């Protein structure tokens, strides 16, 4: 019973960490990363389709992404989708390839992005702590129903806390890495 709670807790904390990584990956650094365009949806015959399904995105150099569209007729639609995204990018097409130069980030913009990253990190930590609270509530319910002893409860809560601490540490590592990435360029 307790092992199931621990496994569920770990799975939910892992999902919270992955969600945080996904949110943070969308925050633009000065370096060209293909994942930057992952959230872009292109109008493909009347339906919104992810850019990744319609084109190949690669980092041409440190400041330029190259988007190779599979269907030539979609070049303008892809270019428009990139232009109208909230990323502030200005694509230019040459044949079947669209080049997306990334403007350098100002010091002020970097600081704003770091604040956003820290806010996302705090939300990630709150999500992890909520998972811990749910697990501890389940353990207390087992104690109340006399399915486990007080010693088992204390031991289980300590193990849940260790799992929580390890995931909070992982969140801090992800945040530190992103901040370093933002300030290095």
Curated annotation (Swiss-Prot):
Database matches in InterPro entries: Ribosome_recyc_fac (IPR002661), Ribosome_recyc_fac_dom (IPR023584), RRF_sf (IPR036191)
Subcellular locations according to the entry: Cytoplasm
SUPFAM superfamilies: Ribosome recycling factor, RRF (SSF55194)
GO cellular component terms listed in the entry, alphabetical order: cytosol
One Pfam entry name: RRF
Keyword annotations from UniProtKB, A to Z: Cytoplasm, Protein biosynthesis
GO molecular function, one term: ribosomal large subunit binding
Keyword Cytoplasm: yes
Any single GO BP term: cytoplasmic translational termination
Domain of life: Bacteria
Cysteine disulfide partners in this protein: none
CDD domains according to UniProt: RRF
Family to which this protein belongs: Belongs to the RRF family.
Functional summary from the UniProt entry: Responsible for the release of ribosomes from messenger RNA at the termination of protein biosynthesis. May increase the efficiency of translation by recycling ribosomes from one round of translation to another.
Name under which the protein is recorded: Ribosome-recycling factor
